[in-house]
Amino acid sequence: MAMTYHLDVVSAEKHMFSGLVQKIQVTGSEGELGIFPGHAPLLTAIKPGMVRIVKQHGEEEFIYLSGGILEVQPSVVTVLADTAIRGTDLDEARALEAKRKAEEHISSSHGDVDYAQASAELAKAIAKLRVIELTRRSM
């Protein structure tokens, strides 16, 4: 049997996941992180993206995160997300529309464009689309 640890994924709205996992993959402030059993304690910010969860028996689940905090302790890992949405609950049409609007906003020639905000919105839309794609592949 594979080594495991306890994972909690919590958002402001609800408790998204709680259970034993083999590993997770998440985008931290310094890049991609793979958290395996026995990982050193860690506290870091999470960028908009996804958490890829490999459960106790090898099944995968993908959850979109709009950002948050990752805490790693010896026997428990906690993801405190600003917003968390299961891949199966994401709306592809809305994500595509958000991506289109963000791209349009960035490319507009108006002087009042807030590029940082538009880029953040684009990153969130792309992350949602990636979670949708990976969720479909794992089914």
Curated annotation (Swiss-Prot):
GO molecular function: ATP binding; proton-transporting ATP synthase activity, rotational mechanism
Transport is among the record's keywords: yes
Species of provenance: Serratia proteamaculans (strain 568)
Transmembrane region(s): none
Keyword field: ATP synthesis, Cell inner membrane, Cell membrane, CF(1), Hydrogen ion transport, Ion transport, Membrane, Transport
Localization in the cell: Cell inner membrane
Pfam family, one: ATP-synt_DE_N
Superkingdom of the source species: Bacteria
Quaternary structure note: F-type ATPases have 2 components, CF(1) - the catalytic core - and CF(0) - the membrane proton channel. CF(1) has five subunits: alpha(3), beta(3), gamma(1), delta(1), epsilon(1). CF(0) has three main subunits: a, b and c.
First-listed, main subcellular location of the protein, grouped into a coarse class: membrane
Matches recorded under HAMAP family: ATP_synth_epsil_bac
Family label: Belongs to the ATPase epsilon chain family.
InterPro entries: ATP_F1_dsu/esu_C_sf, ATP_synth_F1_dsu/esu, ATP_synth_F1_dsu/esu_N, ATP_synth_F1_esu_C, ATPsynth_dsu/esu_N
Lineage: Bacteria, Pseudomonadati, Pseudomonadota, Gammaproteobacteria, Enterobacterales
UniProt-recorded name of the protein: ATP synthase epsilon chain
Membrane topology reported for the UniProt record: Peripheral membrane protein
GO cellular component, one term: proton-transporting ATP synthase complex
Role according to the record: Produces ATP from ADP in the presence of a proton gradient across the membrane.
